[in-house]
């Protein structure tokens, strides 16, 4: 997942015309695959009302603010632009340059987690609560579509419009809609790849500008698959890194993930509910949607994810514990 030819000021090698032609053919295949994936989603999921009802069910709704990178036309962008934040009604409440992120984002700490909980500085930390008064935000495919006014490529724009038409307009708060949003982005990425590889400047041999001074501080932001990714570095007079601050995609979503798990558990487990393996799977769905990597990062060697659910009564006493993994 990490580029091996990145250097200060650029990259170590450009692409040749022969390589460009190979990439062009790959891009065509990628575009067809993206269209196929969306068609498959439509045929298997959208044409099955029970699946649509599951996506829209209250157990998987988490009402938050949203953050994402947009271009000058407020279209989704993965690498450049401004950070845009919208509220629970999809109204813009903040907009800032990536380098100014510390003026807009703060992190809350809980004693039971190594991972911090980012929130919007202008609203403040109000706890693990949903709604318009909460400072919690989400950053992921769902968020990127919610903060944007559209997609920068034609087919992805059509898919974007269908997404919101089907799910009732903006913003979409359904956690399970994350999968559909990811497919819309896949189509955009494939179209964009095809555009870039046909650009006449793509084979320009000038791929690096040697830095002429020692850096002292830098902030970089991209949209990773799991959300907005902030990298912040400070260096000494020799260019050695002395301080690093990272807010990665999963960290942005830490509080919403916790809230989504709680919401799913509360929505699925009622008085008299028999807790089964299938019910554990449906709770698990609430956080796997945030990032495909969570499916890999939270499992044991045999392939099962270690999960424990404790059922408590109104007094907080544990009535039953179910675990696996």
Language-model features and meaning:
Residues 1-226, 250-325:
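Active-site bordering "gate/hinge" segments
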Residues 219-250:
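Active-site and channel-lining beta-strand-loop segments
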């Amino acid at each position: 997942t990490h580029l091996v030819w990145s250097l200060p000021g650029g990259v170590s090698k450009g692409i040749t015309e022969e390589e460009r032609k190979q990439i062009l053919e790959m891009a065509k295949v990628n575009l067809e695959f993206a269209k196929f994936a969306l068609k498959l989603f439509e045929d298997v999921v959208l044409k099955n009302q029970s699946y649509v009802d599951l996506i829209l069910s209250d157990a998987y709704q988490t009402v938050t603010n949203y953050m994402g990178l947009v271009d000058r036309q407020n279209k989704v962008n993965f690498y450049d632009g401004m950070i845009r934040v919208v509220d629970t009604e999809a109204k813009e409440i903040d907009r800032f340059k990536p380098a100014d992120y510390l003026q807009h984002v703060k992190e809350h700490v809980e004693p039971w987690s190594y991972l911090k909980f980012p929130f919007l500085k202008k609203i403040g930390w109000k706890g693990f609560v949903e709604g318009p008064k909460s400072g919690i935000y989400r950053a992921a495919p769902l968020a990127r579509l919610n903060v944007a006014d559209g997609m920068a490529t034609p087919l992805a724009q059509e898919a974007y419009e269908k997404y919101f038409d089907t799910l009732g307009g903006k913003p979409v708060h359904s956690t399970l809609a994350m999968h559909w949003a990811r497919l819309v982005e896949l189509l955009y990425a494939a179209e964009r790849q095809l555009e870039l590889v046909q650009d006449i400047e793509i084979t320009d041999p000038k791929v690096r500008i040697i830095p002429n001074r020692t850096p002292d501080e830098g902030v970089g932001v991209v949209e990773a698959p799991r959300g907005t990714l902030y990298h912040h570095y400070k260096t000494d007079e020799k260019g050695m890194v002395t301080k690093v601050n990272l807010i990665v995609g999963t960290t942005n979503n830490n509080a919403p993930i916790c809230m989504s798990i709680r919401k799913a558990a509360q929505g699925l487990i009622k008085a008299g509910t028999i807790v089964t393996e299938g019910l554990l799977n449906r709770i698990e769905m609430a956080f796997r949607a945030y990032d495909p990597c969570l499916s890999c990062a939270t499992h044991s060697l045999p392939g099962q994810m270690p999960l424990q659910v404790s059922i408590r009564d109104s007094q907080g006493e544990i009535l039953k514990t179910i675990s696996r993994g």
